[in-house]
């Protein structure tokens, strides 16, 4: 069993017998139609694209109600195209890993072309220019990570041949401008708040610079700023897509699926002819398009207005997912866990995050109306976090914790203040914040050192807790005032809102020698 069997029409009964779902549409007909009249180009050929946007389109094509595929362009790691797309005729296998242990296997055939988005690849770049000049093009989208929207001064000086993704996209938009000021929607699908604004500011920066340098007419800047022509909608995306997993690889090999190996590029991208991902997924997009759009609602995309996208993002980041992640990362590291799914079997940690979410954060949740916060958090706690197939680690989530606490917990505390709610009801959120001081010591609950995850403020914050020792007995905890009064870290001065002393008291318990983290966690979770 190989992906090439699909193109060759050499499909044995094994595919169906072993539970592989095959395309229900005419792959070659869709490819021909897309080549002639492309509607969607996606930048970023990584695992999340194949597991989510491409899979959504695959569902739309399977419905028989749509007839165009997606063209993928890679602007950073060109080996992905050479090694994970073109040898397999742009087909891939999506392995959906469910928390029940069930596995879904689907061949994704919605990607009709794969291109290297750089001038040095002459034919590919010429094809991208041709696509951008075609009136049929409706949307370009991105999964290039938040860093991909960066603008470097040196790149702005390169003129019309920039090397960064946003510069290349702006150059292609200039081709569309020259073809008749054709409309287009520029859609970020990356996991960052107000993502459309990040693309917008980058494109505007390049266009402004080029006008200033006399490389393009002022009308081009007006074109990318005209929302009847070019729009930059916001979106909220949520799906975990880890690198190819060895257990999945073994399972596919046992099935007789031969395209089961991992590919590691020179730029250290981990990819494969298959992609493994969790079952739960959300993609909510601001419905602001200037030239029509693919009907991705057929694959489960939720279209709404900008305010609703923002509310969904806040629901996720401030209440229903991210705060639980951070609580598990801080305490998971101190308790010696290396897998989030394993933490969910812990008799203290599971109720810890349940009570943080349902009892303490949910009273001030931002309800977007189109997604039920209780259903969302229920999926997180009961399906997503316990999923044994998701090799997510508390150590990964603990990265940059100082940059996350304000939005993940500070916003809830502010909401209690603004609504006049009784902050004495906050017990486990303060325990998370007390745990952060203990975490900064880099000593686990057995008294052994552990490696603290990278963080831009790590040295600075560790210096604050340096006088404290992880040991029983009296010590002066007054140094913690310098930590818990920092609004840049917590979003509020925790003393000013009446929580500083409570958190200090909890920290004293957590520092009381080996076993104190477990004992303190158990005490407060049980009491709550």
Please identify what each model-predicted range represents.
Residues 1-43, 47-528:
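Substrate/ligand-engaging "lid" and interaction regions
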């Amino acid at each position: 069993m190989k992906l090439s069997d699909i193109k060759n029409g050499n499909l044995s009964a094994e595919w169906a017998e072993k539970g592989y779902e095959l395309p229900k549409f005419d792959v070659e007909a869709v490819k021909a139609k897309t080549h002639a009249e492309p509607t969607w180009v996606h930048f970023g050929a990584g695992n999340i694209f194949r597991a989510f946007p491409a899979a959504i389109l695959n569902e739309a094509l399977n419905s028989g109600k749509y007839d165009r595929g997606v063209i993928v362009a890679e602007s950073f790691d060109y080996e992905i195209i050479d090694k994970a797309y073109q040898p397999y005729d742009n087909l891939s296998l999506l392995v959906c890993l469910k928390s029940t242990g069930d596995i879904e296997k689907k061949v994704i055939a919605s990607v009709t072309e794969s291109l290297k988005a750089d001038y040095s690849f002459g034919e590919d770049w010429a094809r991208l220019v041709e696509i951008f000049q075609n009136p049929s093009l409706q949307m370009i989208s991105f999964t290039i990570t938040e860093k991909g929207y960066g603008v470097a001064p040196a790149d702005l000086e390169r003129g019309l041949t920039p090397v960064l993704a946003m510069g290349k996209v702006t150059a292609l938009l200039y081709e569309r401008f020259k073809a008749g000021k054709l409309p287009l929607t520029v859609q970020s699908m990356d996991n960052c708040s107000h993502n459309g604004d990040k693309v917008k500011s980058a494109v505007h920066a390049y266009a402004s610079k080029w006008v200033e340098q006399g490389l393009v007419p002022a009308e081009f800047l007006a074109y990318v700023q005209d929302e009847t022509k070019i729009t930059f909608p916001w979106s909220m995306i949520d799906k975990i897509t880890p690198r190819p997993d060895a257990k999945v690889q073994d399972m596919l090999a046992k099935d007789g699926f031969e395209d089961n190996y991992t590919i590691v590029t020179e730029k250290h991208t981990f990819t494969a002819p298959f992609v493994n991902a969790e079952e739960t997924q959300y993609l909510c997009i601001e419905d602001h398009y200037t030239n029509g759009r693919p009907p991705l609602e057929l694959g489960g995309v939720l279209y709404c207005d900008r305010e609703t996208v923002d509310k969904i993002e806040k629901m996720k980041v401030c209440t229903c997912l991210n705060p639980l992640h951070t609580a598990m990362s801080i305490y998971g590291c101190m308790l010696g866990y290396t897998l989030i799914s394993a933490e969910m079997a812990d008799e203290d940690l599971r109720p810890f995050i349940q009570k943080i979410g349902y009892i303490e954060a949910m009273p001030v949740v931002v309800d977007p109306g189109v997604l039920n916060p209780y259903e969302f958090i229920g999926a997180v706690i009961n399906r997503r976090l316990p999923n044994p197939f998701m090799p997510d680690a508390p150590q990964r989530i603990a990265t940059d914790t100082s940059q996350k606490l304000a939005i993940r917990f500070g916003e809830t505390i502010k909401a209690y203040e603004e609504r006049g709610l009784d902050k004495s009801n906050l017990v486990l959120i303060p325990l998370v914040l007390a745990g952060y001081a203990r975490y900064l010591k880099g000593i686990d609950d057995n008294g052994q050192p552990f490696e603290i995850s990278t963080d831009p403020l790590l040295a600075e914050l560790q210096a604050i807790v340096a006088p404290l020792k992880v040991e029983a007995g009296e010590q002066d905890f007054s140094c913690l005032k310098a930590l818990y009064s920092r609004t840049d870290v917590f979003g509020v001065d925790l003393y000013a809102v009446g929580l500083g002393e409570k958190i200090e008291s909890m920290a004293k318990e957590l520092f009381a020698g080996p076993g104190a983290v477990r004992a303190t966690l158990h005490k407060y979770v049980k009491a709550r």
